Amino acid sequence: MTTMAETQTWQTVLGEEKQEPYFQEILDFVKKERKAGKIIYPPQKDIFNALKLTPYEAVKVVILGQDPYHGPNQAHGLAFSVRPGVPAPPSLQNIFKELHADLGVSIPSHGFLEKWAKQGVLLLNAALTVEAGKPQSHANIGWHRFTDKVIESLNDHPEGIVFLLWGSYAQKKSQLITNLRHRILKAPHPSPLSAARGFLGCRHFSKANQLLHEMGRGEIDWALDEKVS
């Protein structure tokens, strides 16, 4: 017997949304901006990496970000993650500090979080593109409608998911998560401006694993390999 989770994919839950005029307008806007010579992050091929690397049926944990990193070579389509060889930005450094304090895992020399994504951690930004050097420059081009739909589709997921909502922006999305099978953990944002107000010490990584264990879903190995293949 196949379960609903096995029969559903991002394509089946988001296919109709991608046919909506607004979605094509987003893609057209980004294309025109690039054509006009503006630098847009992440590269075109990486925009939907979060959905490519973490299949719908495999999602166990969701970490929400606001928009992609806006510096050179940083963003590659996974919230908070940076490409191999790029120094971890301050928020990610604080994530690693908390991970070390919580689970004792060593702080990696890189900030490439693909290993998490491949285990079922959806690293989703609310806006999927940004203009170089201009944070939140694409916050109002329609991405939020699409990524809200992603969250709503996860609310309908047949298995329990742990949502890690860091900062007031991410926490507003909790109104989209109404299904009682899911669990929500909230903390301040890991940015240097707010990490000391409760992100550091939140122990969300061990708590997420405990909740996954209780739901019979299998825990996440949060430790990152020292070498990135």
Curated annotation (Swiss-Prot):
Disulfide bonds: none annotated. HAMAP family: UDG. It holds the Pfam family UDG. SUPFAM superfamilies: Uracil-DNA glycosylase-like. It catalyses: Hydrolyzes single-stranded DNA or mismatched double-stranded DNA and polynucleotides, releasing free uracil. Its EC number is 3.2.2.27. This is Uracil-DNA glycosylase. CDD domains: UDG-F1-like (cd10027). The lineage of its organism: Bacteria, Pseudomonadati, Pseudomonadota, Gammaproteobacteria, Legionellales. NCBIfam families: PRK05254.1-1 (NF003588), PRK05254.1-2 (NF003589), PRK05254.1-4 (NF003591), PRK05254.1-5 (NF003592), ung (TIGR00628). Belongs to the uracil-DNA glycosylase (UDG) superfamily. UNG family. It comes from Coxiella burnetii (strain CbuK_Q154) (Coxiella burnetii (strain Q154)). SMART domains: UDG, UreE_C. The active site is at D67. The keyword Cytoplasm applies. GO terms for cellular component: cytoplasm. Its main location: cytoplasm.
